C-alpha cells in the first residue's frame, strides 16, 4: 500500500508553499487509497517551538486535511515527533559506525565557512566538504582528541554514481561524491537531518515522498543512507517551489502568506485550497473547493515542472481583499 507523509519543521509558521506541499502529498496518498502520516521534524530543539507544532496541526486541520498517523492521533509507528525518537537514530548511528561508514570530523565552523567561500564550494546542501578529516591518520585523530575538540560524525560517501527517476523532475543523475561527505551527528550532539528523515521514513513504512524541490539535492545522500541501513528506497517526487510575485522565496514582505495570517483575515479554507489547486495545475479556475473534491482529478502529470509565482492579487485576495 502506498504511504505518503508531510513532515513540517516547527521553526516557523506554515506558509502557502508548505500548505501546497501538504495538500499535494495528501492528494497523492488518497488518490491511491493509501496511508498518510503527519510527522513533526523537531530534531533541532534549539530552533523548534512547540507552539508552532501545535499551530501546524491546527492549520492543516483547518485546511481540511487528515492523517492516519500523527502526533495527535497516534498510530503503530510512533512517536511522531523527532524529539522523541532519538534512541532510534542512535541505533542507526551505531550500525553505520560498526560498519565503518562514519568518521569523526574536527573541522571548525570557520574552516567550513572558508570551504563555502571557495570556488564551487557551496551546494544547495551547504558547503561541499572536501574530506579533510577523512584522510586523517589515527595519530592525527588522537592529537585532535587530546586538544579537547568534540568531533561531528560524517558519512563517508562511496565512490558510486546515484541515479533515480523523480516522479516530477524526471531522470536524475549525481556523480560520485556529489556534495561531499555529510554530517549525521553534529558536534553538539544533535542528529543530522539526513539521517533522522531516512530512519523515520524507513521505520514508518513511507513508500512515496513528495516534497519541495529545494530538497532534491538531499536525495542522493538519503538513498545512500537507505542502502547502508538495508532499507527499501522510497519513490521521490520534488515539487517546483511556490514563489512570491517577485520570484523570490515566500517571505513576510509578500504579505499574509502564512496560514495563520490567512485564517486571521477570515478567508475560508476552501478558497485557499482552490487557489493552491489552480497554481498546481489541478483545476482551470481558482474556485473554492474542499480537498476531498480534488482526489478524482489529482494527477502528478498536471503539476507544473517549473517554479510557480503567486500573483500579487492572489495574495491580496487571500489576505482578505477581493479576488
Curated annotation (Swiss-Prot):
Entry binding sites for L-glutamate: 5-9, 41, 193, 211
Pfam family, one: tRNA-synt_1c
Motif annotated as 'HIGH' region, chain positions: 8-18
Superkingdom of source: Bacteria
Keywords, ordered alphabetically: Aminoacyl-tRNA synthetase, ATP-binding, Ligase, Metal-binding, Nucleotide-binding, Zinc
The EC number(s) this enzyme carries: 6.1.1.-
GO biological process: glutamyl-tRNA aminoacylation; tRNA modification
Annotated positions binding ATP: 252
Motif ('KMSKS' region): 249-253
Matches recorded under InterPro entries: aa-tRNA-synth_I_CS, Glu-Q_tRNA(Asp)_Synthase, Glu/Gln-tRNA-synth, Glu/Gln-tRNA-synth_Ib_cat-dom, GluQ/Sye, Rossmann-like_a/b/a_fold
GO MF assignments: ATP binding; glutamate-tRNA ligase activity; zinc ion binding
Main enzyme class: ligase
Co-factor remark: Binds 1 zinc ion per subunit.
Residues annotated to bind Zn(2+): 105, 107, 129, 133
Entry annotated with the keyword ATP-binding: yes
A GO CC term assigned to this protein in UniProt: cytosol
Matching NCBIfam families: PRK05710.1-3 (NF004314), PRK05710.1-4 (NF004315), queuosine_YadB (TIGR03838)
Family: Belongs to the class-I aminoacyl-tRNA synthetase family. GluQ subfamily.
Function recorded in the entry: Catalyzes the tRNA-independent activation of glutamate in presence of ATP and the subsequent transfer of glutamate onto a tRNA(Asp). Glutamate is transferred on the 2-amino-5-(4,5-dihydroxy-2-cyclopenten-1-yl) moiety of the queuosine in the wobble position of the QUC anticodon.
Official protein name in the record: Glutamyl-Q tRNA(Asp) synthetase
Gene that this polypeptide is encoded by: gluQ
